[in-house]
Curated annotation (Swiss-Prot):
Pathway given in the UniProt record: Cofactor biosynthesis; coenzyme F420 biosynthesis; Cofactor biosynthesis; riboflavin biosynthesis
Chain residues that bind Fe cation 2: H43, D52
Protein name per UniProt: 2-amino-5-formylamino-6-ribosylaminopyrimidin-4(3H)-one 5'-monophosphate deformylase
Superkingdom of this protein's organism: Archaea
Catalytic activity: 2-amino-5-formylamino-6-(5-phospho-D-ribosylamino)pyrimidin-4(3H)-one + H2O = 2,5-diamino-6-(1-D-ribosylamino)pyrimidin-4(3H)-one 5'-phosphate + formate + H(+)
One Gene Ontology MF term: ferrous iron binding
Length: 247
C-alpha cells in the first residue's frame, strides 16, 4: 500500500532530511504514536471528564518528542465494559472502525506504516484482542501499550489523581469534596454492579475505601516515567522489526 506521501516524494524528487533533529533513527519517521483514552467519563471532583485521553496524549506526545516518532493525534471514542456505568462509550466495533480510519489517513498523508497505540483507559483493554483486525485492515504493524492502565491503580484513586496533578489537570482545592456517595465512580466504590461482576474492580474499590485518595507527586512522576519508558521501548521494537524485515 503506497501512501500519497511516498508517491509525492518520488514524483517531485524531493529529498527529505530523515536524519535531521534529535531522533533515535531515520526509520522512526514511519512510526506513529496514537493516544487512546476516554473523553467522556466521570472522575470525581478533582479530575476532569477527559482525564484518560489527556494522560494518554501527554505520554504519546512525550514519547514522540523523545524518539522522533510521529504523534498522530487522539482517538475520539472509547469503549467500556457494559457493567461499568460512569461515562459515555461506544462498542468495540465502532472503536476499531475509528482507529482504522485514523491509521489509513496517517499512512496516506505522512507515510506511517507502523504504530503504537498508547491507551490510558481500562475500558479499552478488550481492544487488545482485536489488534490483528486493525493490522489486517490497515496493512500496518500495531502495538497497543497499556502500561499506564496496568500500574496506575483504581479509577480516580491516588495513582491517577497523582498523575493528573503532575501533568496539571487536577483541581487540588476540591480534594475535600471527595465523597463516594456523591461521586460513586471514585475507585468505583459506589458502582455495585461493576464490583459484583469484576473481582479486580472490587479489590481496587476496597483499597480506596480503606486508604482514601491522596496526591503524591513523587508517585505521579514515577508512574509517568515507567509508562513513558515502556512506550519508547515499543517504538524501538517497531524500528528493529523494520530493520530485520529489510535485511
Amino acid at each position: 500500500m503506497e501512501s500519497r506521501f511516498i508517491k509525492a516524494e518520488r514524483d517531485t524528487k524531493l529529498k527529505l532530511n530523515y536524519d535531521a533533529g534529535n531522533i533515535i533513527s531515520p526509520k522512526v519517521h514511519s512510526v506513529g504514536v496514537l493516544a487512546l483514552g476516554s473523553y467522556l467519563e466521570n472522575h470525581g471532583p478533582v479530575l476532569p471528564i477527559d482525564t484518560d485521553i489527556k494522560i494518554a496524549s501527554y505520554l504519546a506526545l512525550n514519547a514522540s518528542i523523545k524518539t522522533g516518532a510521529k504523534f498522530i493525534g487522539t482517538v475520539y471514542p472509547a469503549t467500556e465494559y457494559p457493567y461499568v456505568k460512569h461515562g459515555i462509550h461506544v462498542s468495540v466495533k465502532d472503536l476499531i472502525e475509528n482507529i482504522v480510519s485514523i491509521m489509513k489517513l496517517a499512512n496516506k498523508y505522512i507515510g506511517i506504516d507502523k504504530s503504537v497505540i498508547v491507551n490510558a483507559h481500562g475500558g479499552n483493554l478488550p481492544l487488545k484482542k482485536h489488534i490483528n483486525v486493525i493490522e489486517r485492515e490497515t496493512g500496518m504493524k500495531i502495538v497497543m501499550n497499556n502500561k499506564i492502565v496496568e500500574i496506575e491503580g483504581p479509577h480516580a484513586g491516588s495513582g491517577e489523581t497523582s498523575l493528573g496533578y503532575v501533568i496539571g489537570i487536577a483541581d487540588v482545592e476540591r480534594m475535600n469534596e471527595i465523597d463516594f456517595k456523591k461521586y460513586p465512580e471514585i475507585g468505583m466504590v459506589g458502582l455495585k454492579s461493576a464490583r459484583k461482576l469484576n473481582k479486580k474492580i472490587d479489590e481496587g474499590a476496597k483499597i480506596v475505601e480503606k486508604e482514601g485518595v491522596k496526591i503524591n507527586p513523587k508517585l505521579g512522576r514515577k508512574l509517568l516515567n515507567i509508562a513513558l519508558n515502556d512506550i519508547i521501548n515499543d517504538i524501538k521494537h517497531l524500528i528493529r522489526m523494520d530493520k530485520n524485515e529489510t535485511k
